[in-house]
Amino acid sequence: MMQRLRRRAILLLALVLIGGAYTVYADQRTRTPEAALMQILHAVRTEDRQLFDTYVDEDAVLTSLHTDVSTLLVDNIDALHARHPADWFFRHDSAFMKNYMEQHRTEHLDAARTALDFYFDTQRVPVTKTDGNARWGSDEMRAFAAHYTADMEPAVIAGDRASVLCRVYGDDTDYGRLLSEGFVTAELVRRENGRWKLVRIRTDPARANGFYAFIDAAERYWELQGWD
């Protein structure tokens, strides 16, 4: 049970990166990467599923996010154990972690998709235990969203692809203090209609307040929830 809670919390923090931070950007043009991200944030804030789907390739984001997180956990398992020696999840070797993440890939992705479904449909009633877990996840997404904001650097555009460095930071509350500052990069592609669509969110262990900042936040989240 505990390992499932921890896995869900990792996914929860990842989902927060999709749209849990709100801010207002100066660029109001509709056909720029920055404007696309602003529309995503607005969709999350207003729980507008149609607008969200217009600017987010959900399958691409979630599958790439799982792949990226899996790779980061495998490649940095020794450093993670040294950083958080009390966490059983980091006491395994890279071979175990690789196999573990591969075995649970479908479960993780299904959980993330269902949590998003509940987020955008507050009238949906949980029926199964899986539904209940997803509903809990969507409620936690709202809790995070209420206490985080973001800003971003100008987009770097190469042909029909763009990357945008975003800084996410919390307020002075229990949830907000979990992550004082974290950096992620949003990747978008330009569709045939000229609009940009989010396809990937990644973070870098080499960047200050990158990957490790989110892991540290997850560890603080365990404590906040009383899971330790």
Label for each model-derived stretch:
Residues 17-20, 95, 114, 131, ...:
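Alpha-helical structural elements
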Residues 11-99, 103:
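Short, low-complexity N-terminal intrinsically disordered segments enriched in polar/charged residues
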Residues 1-5:
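Short, Lys/Arg-rich N-terminal segment immediately upstream of the first membrane anchor
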Residues 74-177:
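Surface-exposed, charged secondary-structure patches
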Residues 14-17, 92, 111, 128, ...:
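Alpha-helical protein-protein interaction elements
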Residues 23, 30-32, 46, 54, ...:
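Residue-identity detector for threonine
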Residues 6-10:
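Alpha-helical transmembrane segments of integral membrane proteins
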Residues 134-228:
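Low-complexity, intrinsically disordered terminal/linker segments enriched in charged
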